[in-house]
Amino acid sequence: MEIASKYNPEEVESKWYNYWMEYGCFISVPDGRKPYTVVIPPPNVTGVLHMGHMLNNTIQDILVRRARMKGYNACWVPGTDHASIATEAKVVGRLAAQGISKQDLGREEFLRHAWDWTHEHGGIILEQLKRLGASCDWTRTAFTMDESRSESVIKVFVDLYNKGLIYRGIRVVNWDPKALTALSDEEVIYKETNGKLYYLRYFVENEPDKYIIVATTRPETIMGDTAVCVNPNDERYRWLRGKRVIVPTVGRAVPIIEDEYVDMEFGTGCLKVTPAHDVNDYMLGQKHRLESIDIFHDNGILNEHGGPYAGMDRFDVRKKIEQDLIDAGLMERVENYVNKVGYSERTDVPIEPKLSMQWFLQMESLAKPALDAVMNDEIKLHPAKFKNTYRHWMENVKDWCISRQLWWGHRIPAYYLPDGSIVVAETAEKAVELARKQTGSDSLTVEDLRQDSDSLDTWFSSWLWPISVFGDVMDPENEELDYYYPTSDLVTAPDILFFWVARMIMAGYEYRGKKPFDNVYLTGIVRDGQGRKMSKSLGNSPDPIMLMEKYGADGVRMGLMMAAPAGNDVLFDESLSEQGRNFCNKIWNAFRLVKGWQQAETSTQPEASALAVKWFGYRLDEVKTELDDLFSKYRLSEALTLVYKLFWDDFSSWYLEMVKPAYGQPMDAKTYGSTIGFFDQLLRLLHPFMPFITEELWHALEPRHDGETIMLCLLPDAHETDRDFLQAFDRTREIIAAIRNIRTGKNIPFKEKLTLEAGNEHDASFDAVIIKMGNLEAINRVEEKTSGSTSFLIGTLEYAIPMGALIDVGEEIKKLSDELAYQEKFLASVMKKLGNESFVAKAPQAVIELEQKKKSDAEARIATLRDSLNQLQSTK
């Protein structure tokens, strides 16, 4: 296979991805091997790739590819989420552009349009993931609303209802007045908003000269007030016990109640209680048995309880009521105030806490095993710092509002009988059977039943994802589930640790009796160089496809991972992708160099090459062991950095230079064979991170059969390494680096041969390497160094290079004198610090030891400099 002069990512990537697909390299079927299973966090079906997806799926692909190369039966299940609110909003928007409303169409016709939209846009993000190199088993692609997943969702709803865990009731929910649906907490984005704090006068009933002042940010909700609450420990309001106050503009008398929930320091210490429009007020209302008055229509317009403001929008009412309160003498004052207001993530309008009839799932009993599993490390979070966050959520779990006022989604399988009673069943036909038994009326038909119009929260399907992707959740004899479940690793973001991860754990224990995954790798947020979260609105998020076109998928993958420690935010800059591309070029050029060498079968292996081969073999084994350790701790960024340095520094900068034959000369076959073997191992270690270039070069190493691929090669095993040899070789590299520094500092060209003088303590084992890499004439053992030499220290051993006519003696004396003056000044500062009794008494022992080491190092350097100066001065 001929290797091109330049690396062309676009050509290489398309060629090898098509090859992997053609030969079914990603496909997994149950067999005798141990499975390694990952399920993709399903992106929105209508979404497109963004940098968060890039990070998440790069990490998954690294883990999956490495597992394959460890001999596991790796199965990465892809799929998409039907994303009820997002998709419905898109379809409603497209219809509105044609002058068509959702209501005009009716449910069935609207759903036809929604399916058309899904089929039209649904495959985009999955195709984009292929550009990234995602090695998913595409034959297993799942969709949360396909037939199999839908059947499982409905069966689970019915099962939980029959267990008494699902119920219908009135609660305060996050309401989107534009989408006209309840929202889950994670669909609410809190934004800092410049608003006002209104101080209102609530006059005491039958005491017209007395009033209390209540602070609120939402005066438009006072029509729903049913109490004013104070803290029982607040001495200021003891006189109000048992009294009632008049709600401003409304004229309704409401009781004063006492509860320690009230913060005495906020505002005036008096809280207006509006149970229908604040979740905390609702809890107070339940506790104190207060009336709940809902003053809003679903669209944010005030209803008949809004009094004179009925028919007005909530924000128009806020402006109008402010002036009305001032005119009535009921406004004490108004202050500017910054607070966090919840906005719908999908429609970007302020949400309305609203009392609403919804379906709920009781969570307390489901949460217990899910909490225990994480706290006892049956399921491990990486990094573990998120355990406390998880525990807080799970110990304070609330019932889950699972209904949405949407048409796109899994329709709730609840059916209303003519008398208003409810039956829950998987199908209308089964519902009729239940209804007949329940009522004793055999004349009931499907037409007599009315199915609930709400759909289930999208998360109600995705919480089953690790189970449902392998078939029927409720099937106890599901062979695929028995083999692939529990899955191995889940890669996701911390912001959905509760909303998705915790719920999957609950579902796993409820429906399989075991955890859904072993480990949860929590990624950070991708931010720009200024630390800002990447977003379309800020214009700071690069297009991943354009990045891959510019730098190649491997380059972008590497750039992301170099800056992606688990659980910490990723400060991404395009220069990281450039660094990744440069590394690809480095690998490519190193390969071309090696393959360009000629072999001589009969030549003897040089001593320097034999030492280099031995050293790099040990170094390679050392890195393999470190890699296994880093992967076991999910420190993937550090793992990549380790392999990067191994290739760039150890292999390219040192090993290849040590074994490189003289210009025009062939390389001995033994060294060449070892070098090709090392390259093969390096490509395997790099493959999980950089799949495309490694596949290309692996095929260029030697002829391959059709269907062969590096991804199905086993990773090389780590063998025992010789640490003493490696440490000795590190000292050898230090000697070579010092010789190079002297050449650079004194402008001595590399072609000029030098002589190195060493003491008797010098280990001569690696002299062949030092002579070659330093271009030395010889290494001589001496009792005293030659006059006019330049010396250097490696540890405590001194080395010298006779300069002779190679340098300007006067210039060298000046340079060494300046360095000596600096070192003497530095030593004086260290001695002053160590002579300070207060410092020595208070400083930690480690700090004192560091200063003492600085002292001894400076003293050794000064002695060497003085000796060198004496030698030079004696030659003048």
UniProtKB/Swiss-Prot annotation:
Parts forming coiled coils: 844-876
A Pfam cross-reference name: tRNA-synt_1
Key word Nucleotide-binding present: yes
Molecular function in Gene Ontology: aminoacyl-tRNA deacylase activity; ATP binding; valine-tRNA ligase activity
Residue ranges annotated as motif 'KMSKS' region: 533-537
InterPro entries xrefs: aa-tRNA-synth_I_CS, aa-tRNA-synth_Ia, Anticodon_Ia_Val, M/V/L/I-tRNA-synth_anticd-bd, Rossmann-like_a/b/a_fold, tRNA-bd_arm, tRNAsynth_Ia_anticodon-bd, Val-tRNA_synth_C_sf
Keywords: Aminoacyl-tRNA synthetase, ATP-binding, Coiled coil, Cytoplasm, Ligase, Nucleotide-binding, Protein biosynthesis
EC number(s) stated in the UniProt entry for this protein: 6.1.1.9
Domain notes: ValRS has two distinct active sites: one for aminoacylation and one for editing. The misactivated threonine is translocated from the active site to the editing site. The C-terminal coiled-coil domain is crucial for aminoacylation activity.
Self-association and partners: Monomer.
Function of the protein: Catalyzes the attachment of valine to tRNA(Val). As ValRS can inadvertently accommodate and process structurally similar amino acids such as threonine, to avoid such errors, it has a 'posttransfer' editing activity that hydrolyzes mischarged Thr-tRNA(Val) in a tRNA-dependent manner.
Similarity section: Belongs to the class-I aminoacyl-tRNA synthetase family. ValS type 1 subfamily.
Record's protein name: Valine--tRNA ligase
Record organism: Porphyromonas gingivalis (strain ATCC BAA-308 / W83)
Classification lineage: Bacteria, Pseudomonadati, Bacteroidota, Bacteroidia, Bacteroidales
